[in-house]
Amino acid sequence: MLLEFRDIQIEDISFFENYWKITSQRASDYSFPILWGWAGDYGYQTAREDDKDLLWIRQTVPRNYDLAPLGKWKRDDWAEIIQKRFGKEAEFWLVPEKLLDLWKLQLGDILEIEDMRGRWEYLYD
């Protein structure tokens, strides 16, 4: 299945919020204000997959980086979904821990993980 990515627009907030609400672990890097606000610098794009309740996110500057999707993470078909949309050599950046745990269970040894300790969430009081 070919995903149709398009640039993030301010009008996308309406459908974006639906995916945000059903995401198991929300990270600030994936919030609409961050993605939309930095879209000019990082070329953020989204592709909706309504039948799977997933919103795929991609960064296009300085090169293409596939990011974790928002939406329904609790599913048992991740291996099939990723292979059909991204192929056998898929590479994802900034995958939240809860999604990574699901992928570890379902993808097993084919998954290579690189911990990026320089990237972390800010905590505010």
Where are these regions (language model features)?
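Acyl-donor-binding surface of acyltransferase catalytic domains
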Residues: 70-125
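N-terminal charged segments
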Residues: 1-83
